[in-house]
Swiss-Prot record:
Keywords: ATP-binding, Cytoplasm, Kinase, Nucleotide biosynthesis, Nucleotide-binding, Transferase
Pathway annotation from the record: Purine metabolism; AMP biosynthesis via salvage pathway; AMP from ADP: step 1/1
Biological process terms in GO annotation: AMP salvage
Protein name: Adenylate kinase
Domain of life, source organism: Bacteria
Reactions catalysed, as given in the entry: AMP + ATP = 2 ADP
Segments for region (LID): 126-136
Record flagged with keyword GTP-binding: no
PROSITE patterns: ADENYLATE_KINASE (PS00113)
Any one GO molecular-function label of the UniProt entry: adenylate kinase activity
Oligomer status and interactors: Monomer.
Positions annotated to bind ATP: G10, A11, G12, K13, G14, T15, R127, G172
Binding sites annotated in the UniProt record for AMP: T31, R36, D57, L58, V59, G85, F86, P87, R88, Q92, R133, R144
Amino acid sequence: MRVVLVGPPGAGKGTQAQILASKLSIPKVSTGDIFRANVSGGTELGKKAQAYMDRGDLVPDEITNAMVRDRLAEDDARAGFLLDGFPRNLAQAETLDEMLADLGVKLDVVLELVVDEEEVIRRLAERARIDNRSDDNEETIRHRLVVYREQTAPLVSFYEKRGLLEKIDAVGPIEEVTQRAMTALKSRA
């Protein structure tokens, strides 16, 4: 099964990605993991990405896209994968379509973890308190939500129009959210 997981910061994407990938016996593919693997492996793409990160700049889409393309072509991703953190915008979604077409496969489903804004703020504020992260104040969190809405709303609409979107209520105990996601995935299998 080929799955994309989207949702606002604090929706539980990392947690659900780990659990769902394990339950489905497919690799969790996250851009963070891919960046770390390429940088620590000293790949050509890793060196290019590192130069941007060292300057505090965002890694351009073409480098991110190339890293994702390479990762999805690996043997363990042939039977399926769960993408976490990619695509983040419409351009990346269109590139993902091209990548998958080149590999001769299609996306099965896009899971959107749905959490209202106040719950996101509560979760991230709590996470900041526990992790002692002073940068995650309410103003910063609200800004991250604005950026998410601007970039990801068109992405959600793009997948909804294609009949790939499953909205998952991501409020409640982790196990319940996982169960809702698994039910949605089984309906697509």
